[in-house]
């Protein structure tokens, strides 16, 4: 896989080729857990702003259901799976991005493992907004309703061995021992990534990064 700088330039070039209009453009970046979505999204945001294009950012992680709700539903061990997100709230926010100039968005605090409401802002000058998340292109259920919202669809797909290494390291960095870190990666995160690849609507992807 190319380095993040090369990937950023590739996506930036696609953005520059998009038809000009006064309407806000929604750029969707999807991929499996630990695929590099967040890093790529932040780099593209910076690149756009360097060129004078104000850009907002909406991470789908801000729509994780609260742990208390997941416990009640018996889903805490599956956190990160499609059914553990507030999909109705997420779809509502995506629709608001096209209808409203300014709004706040929730952000996920990984260290505290919780969502912080209204922690992010989309401003009127943000003519480009990047949305990044696991299930943006899932060809299943309500997720399909999102496909027509995207002006540019980007999917990042590193090799499985790289995903595994990154996921284990992520859990180690969050304080788990090696056994627990491997279990979290193998039992939940990697299956979620395989689900994404098996149910993705490839026909709507404009840029596929490997």
Enumerate the language-model features and the residues they cover.
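Conserved lysine of the Walker
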Residues: 37
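ATP-dependent NMP and nucleoside kinases share a basic, alpha-helical "lid"
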Residues: 112-170
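Short beta-strand-centered segment that lines the nucleotide-binding/catalytic pocket of NTP-utilizing
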Residues: 51-68
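Extreme N-terminal, non-catalytic leader segments
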Residues: 1-28
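Walker A (P-loop) phosphate-binding loop of P-loop NTPases
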Residues: 34
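Conserved nucleotide-sensing/catalytic segment adjacent to the nucleotide-binding pocket
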Residues: 56, 68-112
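Hydrophobic positions on the alpha1 helix immediately C-terminal to the Walker A/P-loop
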Residues: 40
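Small-molecule kinase domains that catalyze NTP-dependent phosphoryl transfer to phosphate-bearing small molecules
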Residues: 116-118, 141-144, 169-210
């Amino acid at each position: 896989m190319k380095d993040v700088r090369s990937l950023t330039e590739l996506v930036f070039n696609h953005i520059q080729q998009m038809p000009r209009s006064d309407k806000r453009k929604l750029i969707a970046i999807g991929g499996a857990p630990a695929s590099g979505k967040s890093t790529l999204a932040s780099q593209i945001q910076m690149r756009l702003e360097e060129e004078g294009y104000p850009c907002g950012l909406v991470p789908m992680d801000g729509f994780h259901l609260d742990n208390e709700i997941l416990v009640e539903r018996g889903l805490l061990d599956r956190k990160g799976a499609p059914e553990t997100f507030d999909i109705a709230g997420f779809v509502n926010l995506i629709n608001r991005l096209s209808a409203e100039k300014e709004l706040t968005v929730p952000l996920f605090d990984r260290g505290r493992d919780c969502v912080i409401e209204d922690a992010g802002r989309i401003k009127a000058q943000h003519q480009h907004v990047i949305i990044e998340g696991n299930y943006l292109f899932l060809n299943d259920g309500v997720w399909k309703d999102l496909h027509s919202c995207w002006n540019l669809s980007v999917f990042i797909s590193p090799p499985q061995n790289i995903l595994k290494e990154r996921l284990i390291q992520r859990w180690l960095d969050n304080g788990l021992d090696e056994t627990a870190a491997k279990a979290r990666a193998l039992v939940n995160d990697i299956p979620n990534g395989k689900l994404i690849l098996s149910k993705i609507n490839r026909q709507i992807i404009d840029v596929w990064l490997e």
